[in-house]
Amino acid sequence: RRSSDLMEYINKNSITVDALCGRGLIRAVGKNSCFDSDKMTVGYALYKKEYGIMEPHAHAEETVIITKSVNGYVSWGSDAHHLQRTIALEEGMILHIPENEWHAFHYDEGGCVEIVFIYGQGDNCRPEDNER
């Protein structure tokens, strides 16, 4: 982690992956992140076998950029038990997920998904935030 006047910078590979149920997080900007902010939350999420299956969840409005997808897809819908829509994910796709829309990222056998997540706030960004 380096600083040049006010700008801070780091390579994502230098940030420890936080292994959570269903995904690994690389917390770049926000609460409990490499760069502290209460105004925004940005980082990477890794979906692969070692983290288990991602459960459907809902949270603050989010923008997602797909940085890697091997047999990956996203499902979304009206509640956790009714994810009626599914699309295959491709590198470079941008998803805008409205506030409180239920969704989950998945992959077929041998696959994985990596995303950049962007929130314009510091609260209600991860399922774990809602459990506290």
Role assignments for model-derived ranges:
Residues 1-3:
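Short, small-residue-biased leader/transition segments that mark boundaries at the very start
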Residues 8-11, 18-22, 38, 78-83, ...:
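Double-stranded beta-helix
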Residues 18-56:
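A short glycine-rich, His/Asp/Glu-containing loop-to-beta-strand
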Residues 31-32, 52-58, 76, 85-87, ...:
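Short histidine-centered beta-strand/loop micro-motifs
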Residues 59-60, 70, 101-102, 111:
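A generic "binding-loop/recognition-motif" signal
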Residues 63-91:
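A short beta-strand-loop-beta hairpin characteristic of the jelly-roll/cupin
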Residues 89-108:
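Conserved metal-binding segment of the jelly-roll/cupin
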